[in-house]
From Swiss-Prot:
Fluoride-specific ion channel. Important for reducing fluoride concentration in the cell, thus reducing its toxicity. This is Fluoride-specific ion channel FluC 2. GO terms for biological process: cellular detoxification of fluoride. Its main location: membrane. It comes from the Bacteria. The lineage of its organism: Bacteria, Bacillati, Cyanobacteriota, Cyanophyceae, Synechococcales. Keywords: Cell inner membrane, Cell membrane, Ion channel, Ion transport, Membrane, Metal-binding, Sodium, Transmembrane, Transmembrane helix, Transport. The keyword Cell cycle does not apply.
Amino acid sequence: MAEQQQQRSLSAELQELVLVALGAVPGALLRWQVALHWADRHLLVNVLGAALLGLLAGLPAAPRRQLLVGIGFCGSLTTFSSWMVDAMQLISAGQIAEAFGLIGLTLGLGVGAAALGFWLGQRLRLLKLPRSEP
């Protein structure tokens, strides 16, 4: 019995790992393409990721969707560390106001995007859409 539960647990973990990986690949590819074509790349991907995570939070719970889109896609799309390096580079260059402007703008837009996404998810939830996995 214990071996059977352990085997099922390993199988479930492997399925979860695959979902995260399947979401991470397109998220990373989108982030890479945004970095190639937009100067404010970190602002764009972080705000987009916040909006999408807000939407997911507003929808009915769906663990597989959270793994695929929330952790996989959004996790590989968004970046905290690169955003902080951008701010530190501005500070190092003596552009302190610009650094704090970048931080404030990203936080403000990110929270606003997450709130808008959550609001939209709640509205979609009210439509009583069928729960899908993922």
